[in-house]
Amino acid sequence: MTNNNLLAQLNDNLDFISRHNGPDRTQQQHMLDTLKVDSIEQMIDKTVPDNIRLLQPMALAKPQSEIEMLATLKGIASKNKVNRSYIGQGYYDTHVPHVILRNVFENPGWYTAYTPYQPEISQGRLEALLNFQQMITDLTAMELSNASLLDEATAAAEAMSLCKRASKNKSNVFFVSDDVHPQTLDVINTRAKYFSFEVVVAPCSELENHDVFGALLQYPGTTGQVHNLEKIIEQAHSKKTLVAVAADLLALTVLKAPGEMGADVVIGSAQRFGVPMGYGGPHAAFMATKEKYKRTIPGRVIGVSIDSKGKPALRMAMQTREQHIRREKANSNICTAQALLANMASFYAVYHGPQGLRKMGRRVNRLTSVLAAGLQKAGIELVHNDFFDTITLQTNEKTDAIYQRALAADLNLRLLPDQLGISLDETTTSADVEALWLAITEQSFNVDDIEQTLSAEFCNIPADCQRTSEYLSHPVFNSYHSETRMLRYLKSLENKDFSLTHGMIPLGSCTMKLNATAQMIPVTWPEFSRMHPFAPSDQCTGYETLAESFSDMLIEITGYDAFSLQPNSGAQGEYAGLIAIQRYHASRGEDYRNICLIPSSAHGTNPASASMVSMRIVLVNCDKEGNVDLDDLKEKINLHRDQLSAMMITYPSTHGVYEESIKEICELIHEAGGQVYLDGANMNAQVGLTSPGFIGADVSHLNLHKTFCIPHGGGGPGMGPIGVKSHLADFLPGHSVTNTVGAVSATALGSASILPISWAYIALMGAEGLKSATELAILNANYIMEKLSPHYPILFRGKQGRVAHECIIDLRPLKESSGISEEDVAKRLMDFGFHAPTMSFPVAGTLMIEPTESESLEELDKFIDALITIRHEIAKVEEGTWTLADNPLVNAPHTLNDLTGSDWPRAYSRLTACYPSSCPSQPKFWPTTNRIDNVYGDRNLICSCPPIESYQSTDT
């Protein structure tokens, strides 16, 4: 370092890169020495095929410091104009209770956890999600709810699919009320097209005139009207038609529940229960239904079971009915949820309680009645006189003038043909109502004076629509209304869950890397969080700038030509990408191309997504090294050449290796007229070294919650934007807001408010930083592989003996020799303070390990030592020192009660059970329950909150 360029070197802004990447230079060299290579470059040369290596570095802006990045992003955010939005249409301003904002939404203990597939270390969020299900079933008066879906429009499309599967009416027509939200109709039309359903849109009163397998009604309607649906539903049932109702949760605090009117399915959004609008998301949608449809409901369902000691414990129930597991037989590809947002909504209900929520609903309705009365006094005509929180004004030729006056007063109304819509919400005040009167009528009124003219409460809700039944009577919704008690309840749940705040989560194919604090901060900025997704475009310049900038970044990283940011999950990205392929073929007069080739090792969402666009799935074999069998591929191509639509393939492969023949595979598909869908789940092993576009793929989705640092949230949110080559750009998802078709999500930018996280990651890392992250992810995985290979068989390796960013250890031989299963090893790792790797995917009886670039050598070594110790424990079972029925593996995990209880009937010590690799003085994460009985939970299905006696005290 010379004095001539000292300042430039001190200002290099590379600090964040070293903070994101786990191993420092010294640790990297130690790992390289273990691998017997001289440098990272040499290791990459031995791992990544030369013919797919990028010829030049990515052309991204130089890395910014955290301070610079936040300043840049603040400048972008400031371009958004945050008006008072009364647009409604399923999106409402809300007050996020500060105790939830700080202790859940902004808390890495909640947002860095993974989906609770390991329930013994997930009891906290499982309880919160069970509360969510109880909240939904109570408010809707249904019997069963799932633990959230991606958005309300997606939930409506899923409801249509459920109706088709469960209905005894053989029609192929689905009825949609003309008063549903337009974005919901968009997504239904897309889904229906590829299921070959006909969609009829008409007033709900005309449902009896149609022979349909199912119907969707909105309650209240998108224009605000409230009317009793009981007779309409009864008439539909007489024709064996199933009826789904899209309902508003806050409205259900004062309106008669859809379940009380006979609904078969109820869907909607929990957004207004304390989750910011965020320009469209992320939000937790919901679906509730009848008990008899429990095997048909999509998404995750939390259930009550027991552990090995017979104590109540929670788990995800009926996992074998999840659609991604059903593969090509699926009607849905749902494999994620919106857990973080569902938890926030459930905590909102816990904090406010039934009385607080009902008071809120009463207040919103009263303000709406006062607003309507003042407008009528000024001569404004209402389209409907029965409403909850939304009124529609018949303004005719005055529509534009009134709309513009409102805009001039920084008020957003909903613009309809010759009409204006106004939706009030929790945040609306009396002053807001008076401002609306002034803008709309140019007259001043006083709220108190107008209220005096009203009759009894609920004067604008028909008597047969007023709720009389109780809800949220479980003690959990009636106990935590002081901030002190709520804070302790939240903390008690958080303390039960393992997250990245505790240690490595080495889940293969999940990329549980650092979610840096600086990247998370902008999510709660009001310039991002309070934007309505259907606000006028000139108010949304900040989001448009962010989306364009982020898309440009992804284009450079992937080698594609265009991006859509609309899909709300990786599976939804797959669906959108396959639709783009099918629309492309149709545009060329080749809509007969409907064969999708999929390797036998593929994730279950691949065949599920292909099934959803009516593709016929043909499986391609893999060889003993885990690669696509080229001979079998060529045979399948020749057999289906004229009908070949696409091939779906993951790269690096699902088996964790860089297939040498990937370019040849792409060429073979293209020669036969097909398109290549490259699943971006493993993009963390590509960035900066290769790219889907360079390899030869046509379309990919990217999991922003994997490679690009959006946190997993304990089971969502996620995002799955899709990139395409130029010939597919015209077939990306559209939206009615832009007068285009093909929507897969409710809003054009999907879960827009979490885009700043991934934008910030790329801005902080720059091209070299992103490349180094990829290299270190590969280094960490190969180091684990090298250290474990003397103890466990490594199932798949590349041509030169290397793995990509993950490795698979094969436990099948050990199960044969000892009886110890992969589940036993996974549960035993909890006793060492680790989350288990991915179990039995992509091969049954294995564990797939992905350390990511963010873990240090110290953490890797502790994990390796744990697995080596476990191997020695297995040897004791093999040798007969421990019996198969009584050893620390089959009895794992062990709890604090095991350590301190009076009874210990085991052949091994408590110290061996609870502190297998550390002394008792060291910190340890404790599972809060013993191993959970999955079979019992499915045979005795309970998906609502158990009696309060089953809960331990959360105040002690």
From Swiss-Prot:
Catalytic activity reads: N(6)-[(R)-lipoyl]-L-lysyl-[glycine-cleavage complex H protein] + glycine + H(+) = N(6)-[(R)-S(8)-aminomethyldihydrolipoyl]-L-lysyl-[glycine-cleavage complex H protein] + CO2
Would you identify the family this protein belongs to, as annotated? Belongs to the GcvP family.
Q: Which organism is it from?
A: Colwellia psychrerythraea (strain 34H / ATCC BAA-681) (Vibrio psychroerythus)
Q: Which HAMAP family match?
A: GcvP (MF_00711)
Role played: The glycine cleavage system catalyzes the degradation of glycine. The P protein binds the alpha-amino group of glycine through its pyridoxal phosphate cofactor; CO(2) is released and the remaining methylamine moiety is then transferred to the lipoamide cofactor of the H protein.
Q: How does this chain assemble?
A: The glycine cleavage system is composed of four proteins: P, T, L and H.
- Required cofactor(s): pyridoxal 5'-phosphate
Single GO MF descriptor: pyridoxal phosphate binding
Which gene name belongs to this protein?
gcvP2
Q: What is its EC number?
A: 1.4.4.2
**GO cellular component entries:** cytosol; glycine cleavage complex
Q: Which residues carry this modification: N6-(pyridoxal phosphate)lysine?
A: 706
SUPFAM superfamilies for this protein = PLP-dependent transferases (SSF53383)
Its name, as the record gives it, is: Glycine dehydrogenase (decarboxylating) 2
Q: Which CDD domains match?
A: GDC-P
What does the entry give for GO biological process?
Answer: glycine decarboxylation via glycine cleavage system
**Which keywords does this chain's UniProt record carry?**
Oxidoreductase, Pyridoxal phosphate
Top-level taxon:
Bacteria
